Amino acid sequence: MQQIRIPLSKIVFVFLVVLGCQQEKKLPFLGPKEVGEQGDTLYHKIPDFKFLNQDSLWVSQKDMAGKIYVADFFFTTCPTICPKMKTQLLRIYDKFAEDDRVRILSHTIDPEYDGVRVLKDYAKKLNITSPRWNLVTGKKSDIYRLGKKSYMVTAQEDANEEGGFVHSGAFILVDQNRHVRGIYDGTKEEDVNHLIEDMTLLLKE
Amino acid sequence: MINKLAILGLMIIGISCESREEITRQQYVVEGMNLYQTNCANCHQVDGSGLKDLYPPLARTDLWQRVKMSELACIIKHGQKDSIQVNGKPYNAYMPANPKLQALDIAELMTYMREKWSPNKTIFSLDSARYALKNCP
C-alpha cells in the first residue's frame, strides 16, 4: 500500500488560508448601488441631514463622521414596540459605553409632540446623554423622507394604528462613511445580539 | 363506622373543592402569563423590572400592599393619565388603556402578577374583576 505524505508546510499553508478567509468576513453594503464614472461601484449613502437633539443642539452628518451609528425611528408616546426598542438600544448604549466611535441616533416620527423639551425629559428618564445617544426632532417631511429613502424603513402617520403612527422596529447600522451595513429587528433580543457582533466587526474596518 | 365514612367523605369533598380552586388559579396564572407578555411586558419588561425612570417596575414594589387590587384592575383596563408613585418615586409617562381586555383577562393577569410579585399569592377571581371594573372611577 502506498502511503500518501503531505508535507507539514502545505498543511500549515492551507490552515492559514482558511484562517485568513474567516478573518475577512465583511458586512455587506445595503441599498441601491450605482456605477460611477470610472466604472466603480457607488454604494448607497445617507445624505446630509440636520436635526435638533434633546439638548437643543444641531446634529448633522458631520457629527457622525468617522463614527459608526445605529439609527432608529420612534415616538415618546408609542404604546407598542418603542419601549422594546429602547430596552434593546440601552443594551447597545451600555455595551459601547467606553467607545467614542459609536453613536445612537433616534429620530422621532411625531415631531409635533416630541419637541426638544419632551425629548429631554425622555432622555433624562432613560438616563442617557448626547452626543453618544441623540434623540432628534425636525421637520416631519424631512424625517419621513430620510427614513424611507435613506434608511429604508417605513415611518408614516396612520390613524388606524395604535398610537397613530405606523413604523418598523428596525435598527439600521451605518458605517464610518455613511453606508448602510445592516438592518435588524430592534424588538428581538437575538437580532440585536447579532447587531452588536456586527458593530464590533465594523469597528475593525 | 358510618361516622368514619362520613368524615372521610367530607374530607374528600373538602380536598377536591380546594384543589378545584387551586386548579383554576393555576390556569389563570398560565393564561395570565401569556396576556402579560403580549400586553404589558413591552414597557414593564418580562421580569417586571420596568424601564429606568420611564416605566415603573412591578416586581419588588410596594404596589401590591399599598394600592387596592380593584384600583390596579381599573388602571390595566382604562390606563393611567396621572402620575403614580411606586417605591416612593413618581412616574408620569401615561399608560395606555387596554380596552380589548375583558374581565376574565384581567382576572388572569392579576392572578399571574400576584403569583409572581405579590406576597399574597391568591386568585383574583372573575367576580372580583367584574366587580372592580364595574366600579372604576
Regions found by a protein language model. Give the residues of each.
Chain B
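Electrostatic cytochrome c docking/interface patches
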Residues: 17-35
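Solvent-exposed helix-loop boundary motif
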Residues: 72-81
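N-terminal, post-signal-peptide region of Sec/Tat-exported proteins
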Residues: 50-70
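The canonical Cys-X-X-Cys-His
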Residues: 32-46, 95, 109-113
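Hydrophobic h-region of N-terminal signal peptides that target proteins for export
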Residues: 10-18
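Cys/His-rich metal-chelating microdomains
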Residues: 20, 46-49
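Axial heme c-ligation environment in periplasmic c-type cytochrome domains
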Residues: 53-59, 81-134
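Sec-dependent signal peptide recognition
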Residues: 2-8
